[in-house]
Amino acid sequence: MKMKAKWLPIAAAVTAALASQAAFAVDFHGYFRSGVGVSGDGDMVKYNVNKVGRLGNENDTYGEVQLGQEVFNKDGKTFYVDSMFAMASNGSNDWEGTGTVCNFDAKQCSGDSDFALRQFNVQAKGLLGFAPEATLWAGKRYYQRHDIHISDFYYWNISGAGAGIEGIQAGPGKISFAWIRNDRSAKDVFGEYTNTGTSAAPNYVKNEDLNVNTLDLRYAGIPLWSEASLEVGAMYALVNETEAQKPLKNNNMKDGVMLTAELTQGILGGFNKTVLQYGTEGYSKTMAFYGDGSWYGAEAKDGADGFRIINWGVVPMGNNFEMGHQLVYGVGNEMWDGNDKFETMSAVVRPMYKWDDFNKTIFEGGYFKDKNKSTNGTTEDDSGYKLTLAQAWSAGSSFWARPEIRVFASYLANDEDKKVFESGTSKDTYQVGVQAEAWW
């Protein structure tokens, strides 16, 4: 009995330590995709993924590692620190880093791999007396991103460094407000360099990037009819040029507004989303070029505007079939001198047949068409398509089940007889490969 009593304080201390660790456990999340493949001319290509779909159309290795922890919890007040690092490469070698040589291979690998800090922020709850349920946050983060998975198309997303209040209960829905920085490169707006000298004695000075701040207001979770909800939002981009940039400023560098309404309808255990978006000034380019709001085209011509209609979803079709789809139509008007109207349309379908809980066959077909009409009446068209057949093994039968390993074959073609493949020698190509994808 004395021996048992002797060890009781130690056991109590160990138990307390373990309980403390459990209470403040590190949350580990992530995403990755990687594989190997070949095309009709060397390694694989990536062709208009947002427009024709991503299955069998990705030639990279990409990964995200997210670590977060609740570091304080007392009297209903919590503080959470979140972080994420990302890596992107072409997957061409065993060792891929920021160096210039791959191991002992003479192949130069400068820029072979990129590393980025994607998130680092603090999220606090219970601090606001008027809204204890809301989250007060600051730092760099992914912010309420809306995307279509089958095409990797983010259509509503202002992620970046900023601050905000998220999830204030207001009637049936919740209000969120954020201020996020999304600068535009000097090269896109007024040129990378400015000549402060003369033509005879030039003196080129490198221009700074244009500071752009975005104010974002959203009202989400508005209930409508059965299994239907609505989310609406407004973004306002403020152009904030420096004194040195004011002489370079022209009428084109204007503030802009982006409005979004998203209707979500539950269907047979799946869902369908219809999205309406309208943008002015720099957001006209968001509508035309598959943007998401995280970049602002401040160089757009004064008075430019655009709109976009999106329909997408994933719906079960019986016990063994599921179907994912995307339909997009976007327009940008008078975005630069000589531009009258830019139209884009795309459609992607991804039906899937489940053989059992771990084995599935997937088809993905996508088509797009772009039309750029000039003020002189001429038009320039571009269109293309992709067809992919894949056999996949995944951790479950769901459309969203991951990890997944897939073997695929794809055919890609330009529909305007433009030789955009195989080093500019062919209007089409094929590619075959194996890819793994996971999120957790």
Curated annotation (Swiss-Prot):
Residues 1-25 form the signal peptide. The keyword Cytoplasm does not apply. Induction: By maltose. It is a multi-pass membrane protein. It is found in: Cell outer membrane. Gene3D superfamilies: Porin, LamB type. InterPro entries: G_neg_Bact_CarbUptk_Porin, Maltoporin, Porin_LamB, Porin_LamB_sf. The record marks 31, 62, 95, 271, 400, 439 as: Greasy slide, important in sugar transport. SUPFAM superfamilies: Porins. The record marks 154 as: Important in sugar transport. It comes from the Bacteria. GO terms for molecular function: maltodextrin transmembrane transporter activity; maltose transporting porin activity. GO terms for cellular component: cell outer membrane; pore complex. GO terms for biological process: monoatomic ion transport. Keywords: Cell outer membrane, Ion transport, Membrane, Porin, Signal, Sugar transport, Transmembrane, Transmembrane beta strand, Transport. It holds the Pfam family LamB. CDD domains: Maltoporin-like (cd01346). It catalyses: beta-maltose(in) = beta-maltose(out). PANTHER family: CRYPTIC OUTER MEMBRANE PORIN BGLH-RELATED. Homotrimer formed of three 18-stranded antiparallel beta-barrels, containing three independent channels. Involved in the transport of maltose and maltodextrins. Belongs to the porin LamB (TC 1.B.3) family. This is Maltoporin. It comes from Aeromonas hydrophila subsp. hydrophila (strain ATCC 7966 / DSM 30187 / BCRC 13018 / CCUG 14551 / JCM 1027 / KCTC 2358 / NCIMB 9240 / NCTC 8049). The gene is lamB.
